[in-house]
Amino acid sequence: MKQGDRIPGLVGWEHHGAPAKIPGLEVVAEGLVWSGGVTSSRYTATIVPGPKNNFVFNAATIFWAQGLASPPGHMPPWSHWARPAGPDPRVQRITENLLRRALGG
């Protein structure tokens, strides 16, 4: 993906705003969402380096798992003008890349 690309329905009603000032923190996605359908709010997804050549990925959204899979019987959540769009190959690929990075590959 490149700057400006969007994944509709990925940022849910719970999301993280401006990141903390942490050395080495990398912003990997950011943008505006509409809180309550009327008020704009910022979300920021980040990767934070750890002390042992590890990292923490903060997707900044409660809906990240919705972009990975939709098993039989799964009922997608929706509320507050937010509804996930379901599995998305880009979310799956981003997650795969993060797991490969975590495993050192």
Task: Tell what function each PLM region has.
Residues 1-105:
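Extracellular ligand-binding/catalytic regions of CAZymes and related secreted enzymes
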